[in-house]
């Protein structure tokens, strides 16, 4: 039963947590949203500098909230890939320093594996095998979860990730950053059937469409053309209806692919991870479809959908219990397929 101090700095949240297997003792998140809103997206250098300023206060607060000290910690973990290089380096450098100082083993964690483990934190009885729909700002993936560190990629996006599409469409609608929660909020008072938008489908060379891969560039372009047409006609933007129609199309597309994949692979359980997992339309459509097909579907609580260190600690605890440790020589990586997770361990 390992107690892990974990650090997550892969993008624009400085996060520190203390977890014991699947129990959260503390989960501190310092968001940088306000800093990046001015730029309409994450600025890597700004993110790195802010991580440097907030990492120590977050570490202190994590111990205070958990009411623990260093003698209670068995291992130290940090996200090592994928992510922004400068941002990752802040968290990993802090974790390695603490590992040496307090003589604790270091566990490097794959960010996407962390999102998978967010479901374990809210569903203690969840066990592989299951299908994970991982939808975030940088990824849209259908992952066959076979065991700790053992994954098969069944579907992915060919262009924009779902979260990225939300941000881009939000800009088209003259909304702020981050786009996901703002579009969701606007959609609550909009008509999801006001506009017919194309679902993202990926053509195969031999004909037909890939059953599990996604594409959101065409959907984004369709919204752009609608906006341009309305502006040319000097009409006001029906922002709420556009937001609802866009969100409905994304949710419907992801639901179809996820259910098809689960049925094709005889997987009876679906877990959802990533920030887009907080989207109300996706939760509604996927829950309804799963019930119709006698499948179980698990969504983490909203606070565990977005980046946090508790999910990193949960993944690290599982690796710790299996004797998987990372050398201090390990570096950070901007990209690393989740199928190569075990390369992080000796």
Curated annotation (Swiss-Prot):
Its EC number is 2.3.1.234. One of its GO terms (cellular component) is cytoplasm. Fe cation binds at residues 111, 115, 307. InterPro entries: ATPase_NBD, Gcp-like_dom, KAE1/TsaD, Peptidase_M22_CS, TsaD. PROSITE patterns: GLYCOPROTEASE. Required for the formation of a threonylcarbamoyl group on adenosine at position 37 (t(6)A37) in tRNAs that read codons beginning with adenine. Is involved in the transfer of the threonylcarbamoyl moiety of threonylcarbamoyl-AMP (TC-AMP) to the N6 group of A37, together with TsaE and TsaB. TsaD likely plays a direct catalytic role in this reaction. This is tRNA N6-adenosine threonylcarbamoyltransferase.
């Amino acid at each position: 039963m390992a107690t892990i101090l974990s650090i997550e700095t892969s993008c624009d949240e400085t996060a520190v947590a203390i977890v014991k297997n699947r129990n959260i003792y503390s989960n501190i998140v310092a968001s940088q949203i306000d800093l990046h809103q001015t730029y309409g997206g994450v600025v890597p250098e700004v993110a790195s500098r802010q991580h440097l300023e907030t990492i120590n206060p977050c570490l202190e607060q994590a111990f205070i909230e958990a009411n623990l000290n260093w003698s209670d910690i068995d291992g130290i973990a940090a996200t090592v890939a994928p992510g922004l290089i400068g941002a990752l380096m802040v968290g990993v450098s802090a974790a390695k320093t603490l590992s040496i100082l307090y003589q604790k083993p270091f566990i490097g964690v794959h960010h996407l594996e962390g999102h998978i483990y967010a479901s374990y934190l809210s569903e203690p009885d969840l066990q592989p095998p299951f299908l994970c729909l991982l939808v975030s700002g940088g990824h849209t993936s259908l992952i066959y979860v076979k065991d700790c560190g053992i994954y098969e990629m069944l579907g992915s996006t060919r262009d924009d990730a779902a979260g990225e599409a939300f941000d881009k469409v939000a800009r088209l609608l003259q909304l702020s950053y981050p786009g996901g929660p703002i579009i969701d909020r606007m959609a609550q008072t909009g008509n999801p059937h006001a506009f017919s938008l194309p679902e993202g489908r990926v053509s195969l060379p031999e004909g037909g469409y890939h059953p599990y891969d996604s594409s959101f560039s065409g959907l984004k372009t369709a919204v752009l053309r609608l906006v341009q047409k309305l502006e040319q006609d000097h009409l006001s933007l029906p922002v709420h209806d556009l937001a609802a129609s866009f969100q409905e199309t994304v949710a419907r597309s992801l639901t179809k692919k996820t259910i098809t994949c689960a049925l094709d692979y005889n997987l009876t359980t679906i877990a959802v991870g990533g920030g887009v997992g907080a989207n109300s339309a996706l939760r509604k459509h996927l829950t309804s479809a799963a019930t119709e097909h006698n499948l179980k579907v698990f969504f983490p609580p909203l606070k565990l959908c977005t980046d946090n260190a508790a999910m990193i600690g949960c993944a690290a605890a599982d690796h710790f219990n299996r004797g998987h440790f990372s050398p201090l020589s390990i570096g950070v990586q901007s990209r690393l397929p989740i199928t190569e997770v075990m390369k992080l361990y000796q």
